[in-house]
Amino acid sequence: MLTGSSGKAFILSILQASPSARDSRSYLSSFAPPQPVDIATATPAATPSDGAQPPAQNPLVNALLNPILRRPALVKIQGPFTDAQLESICRGMAHLQKLGLVSVIVVDRDDLPSTESSDRYEAQRQRAIVRHEVERVVHFLSRHRAAARPVFSTVARIADPELEPEEAQKGVFVEEEGLDHVRRAVGEGEIPVLLPVALDSGCRSRRIPANRVLLALASAMSTHTSSPVDLTPRRLLVINREGGIPSYARQGLPHLYINLASEFSYINRTFQPQWNDSHPTALSNLFLANGCLAHMPREASALIVSHRSPAALIANLITNKPAHSASLPHALLVESEGRITRDTPTLIRKGLPVRVLRSMEEVDQDKLTHLLETSFKRTLDREGFYNRLKNDLDFVIVIGDYAGAAVCTLEGKPVSDSFAYPPNHPEPICYLDKFAVHPSHQGDGTVDFLWVALRDETYGLGQLDASNPSIGSLRGVGRGRDLVWRSRSDNPVNKWYYERSSGFLKTRDEKWKVFWCDAEQRLGEIWREREFGGGRLVRVVEKEEKGRVKWWEEVIGAIPSAWSA
């Protein structure tokens, strides 16, 4: 029973997560118990009733408040924290436990050297500090009625290359005996709180970096899955004082969403020297996420979050999404209410590589056809569609092995020597012909990664944050172009398009909506010109933009359908 201020705060934190229908299905698939069908009672005969029937129960609400399945998460509490700060963190851990996520916590103190001192007395002092941290965490968890278990035994071992050659590459590993401490706690719904220690080859317990213990746990918990308790971790949570991973493109504000397969090396290369002072553990936590997620399921994620953002923990569990969609307009992210701050968390996924293909010879037509037909549930007119692309292709962005794709064409090109572009429009239209994500990848971040790559190649080109590491991309070099596309008026995806477009209009027959994203570089130049020329605001339609929407509608309206009748 949830009562008092703590219970109200718990319910409020769930409501603030605002899960979508897809988020709800994802949460239910992981944490709700399977619903057995009783044949004898599956279709009861209708019987008269004198009283009102009780309202139907909501399965998401039931699963959130009464979870049956318990899933583990790896958590690093990276202190030092004051009592008030640590209590706030433990309150979040207690809420996660109520929702079915049992935290396997490793305490850390980034004010201590990462490895144990060679001086015996100093080493003992450091060990006493981290042991006290374990006791503090257990105390505050218990205060919030979260069953917790301090684990002072050593669960990890430092591999001896001569005696354990198979484990030597890992450096630190967890054996079945050590894993039993975690298994028993998770099986009983308790939160194990571990020391960052390991046994060396001489059976001496030594303090080691917490990251090495977490990496060893991620490997062992994902490998030893034969027991009744499934220990495969669903989340990695790093709670620190720094906040998320700083972004070069956002001038030091955090990354919202990181696609490790595409961005890992790039983030390391663009990490600025001054961030070593403001975010001294950012890169080590990025390496930690990369290593742990390599062992975890595809849908798993890592969250790097400040202790000042406790609500992000529950939002991440329920939605498995970043605090803000990374594909939203940059101005909306940095200027609107609820904008990005230093404390905004960074969500990290394994992700998929991103490629930009600029010729039909690079495109796998069979795989693209399968993606489009599966996503749209329609049959592609292959001959007509690919013949048109041979003449009009601008580029194709491909995520992974065609898990998603964006096809852009150049429309309104000269058809004869006498052809003349409309005034103020001296180039073809950059038209988003197809945008598709395979159903198996919907909800796992692929759509955001795809849209961000599309933005960087079109309307965001020329901006600092368009410098991305995608294979074949323009790396931010060039001049941005307006991006235009159309969608059926009754398409449920239009709500998503409204949030990302600069504007839209209905066609005369009202069957379509034409959307567009204005080139950010051009808008920035207009804004600066107005700012230094008297402060006049940018008009809804600037002089150089007059007539463009009418031209777009005419040209796009003439594009034939890509689908078979």
UniProtKB/Swiss-Prot annotation:
Positions of the N-acetyltransferase domain: 352-540
UniProt subcellular location: Mitochondrion
Top-level taxon in the UniProt lineage: Eukaryota
Chief place of localization: mitochondrion
Pathway: Amino-acid biosynthesis; L-arginine biosynthesis; N(2)-acetyl-L-ornithine from L-glutamate: step 1/4
Gene Ontology cellular component terms for the protein in this record: mitochondrial matrix
EC number: 2.3.1.1
A GO molecular function held by the record: L-glutamate N-acetyltransferase activity
Classification via InterPro entries: AceGlu_kinase-like_sf, Acyl_CoA_acyltransferase, GNAT_dom, Vertebrate-like_GNAT_dom
Gene3D superfamilies: 3.40.630.30, Acetylglutamate kinase-like
CDD domains (UniProt xref): DUF619-NAGS-FABP
Key words, A-Z: Acyltransferase, Amino-acid biosynthesis, Mitochondrion, Transferase, Transit peptide
Swiss-Prot/TrEMBL catalytic activity: L-glutamate + acetyl-CoA = N-acetyl-L-glutamate + CoA + H(+)
UniProt family annotation: Belongs to the acetyltransferase family.
Function: N-acetylglutamate synthase involved in arginine biosynthesis.
Protein name (Swiss-Prot/TrEMBL): Amino-acid acetyltransferase, mitochondrial
Originating species: Cryptococcus neoformans var. neoformans serotype D (strain B-3501A)
Organism taxonomic ancestry: Eukaryota, Fungi, Dikarya, Basidiomycota, Agaricomycotina
Gene, per the UniProt record: ARG2
